[in-house]
Amino acid sequence: KKKLRKLSENKQPLASVVLICHNEETRLLSCLWSLCDNECDFPIEILAVNNNSTDRTEAVMQQLGVTYFNETKEGPGHARQCGLNQAKGKYHICIDTDTIYPSRYIKTHVKQLMKPGVACTFSLWSFIPDERHSATGLWWYEALRDLHLRIQSIQRPELCVRGMTFGFNTELGRKFGFRTDIIRGEDGSLALAMKPYGKLVFIHSGKARVMTGYGTLNNDGSLFNSFKTRLVKAFKGAGSMFTRKNEYKDEDNNLIKNK
């Protein structure tokens, strides 16, 4: 709480670290704890966006003293855009509340963003082992997934971007804004829009590797089924990974108006 209060006093932060929260009362504290423990030798601000939560998320925000804003239009695009509108930093670091960040995460991203010609940065993520997901199974899954992402990033880095590990130049991000008409992919869409204006830097370092929840990984049931589903999808699109693409057609089931 003291660290959050001190951070709120930074009137000219170099980086804005922005969480989006929808019903995250049980995860908010651990996420903020990891962010407050980050080692930074430059001023930052930590902002949170309460995205139409129906649990005690807002009450926890008030109790912790984090600077936050309410966004009543539900969806990650709306929440991230709200945070972008409020950010004061030259660089913008996107944060998911169900994720834990290593102590040099912010510094590692900002160091790359400060290099000439860099538009955005993105990094890798791991999952926390539990009763449904063994450490060994996750190791193999992540190793093969990381290999796929490294190959894919050569020509189509925008497809490797995830909002929980995404940073960018704030001014450039505001030029395009986050898409609010899609259910997922607002982060990669913004990265694609920024692609002609600078490099999309893939950070492989463990200093920027986060620990996150399972999200869509659980939609396919077991870890094996998740791996099989993604492997089939990867093989189907293997040829296209080696060609650049500047535009993607929206899938009907990903459009909010059809939801």
Give the label of every model feature segment:
Residues 104-135:
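Conserved donor NDP-sugar-binding/catalytic core segment of glycosyltransferases
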Residues 71-87:
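Glycine-rich, basic loop-to-helix element that forms the pyrophosphate-binding segment
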Residues 184-190:
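Acidic donor-binding loop at a coil-to-helix junction in glycosyltransferase catalytic cores
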Residues 123-129, 137-159, 163:
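Short, flexible, basic/aromatic active-site loop/helix in glycosyltransferases
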Residues 1-34:
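N-proximal low-complexity "stem/linker" segments adjacent to membrane-targeting elements
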Residues 34, 50-58, 99:
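A conserved acidic beta->alpha catalytic loop
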Residues 92:
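Short aromatic/hydrophobic "clamp" motif used to bind/position activated sugar donors
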Residues 33-43:
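Short, acidic, metal-binding catalytic loop of nucleotide-sugar glycosyltransferases
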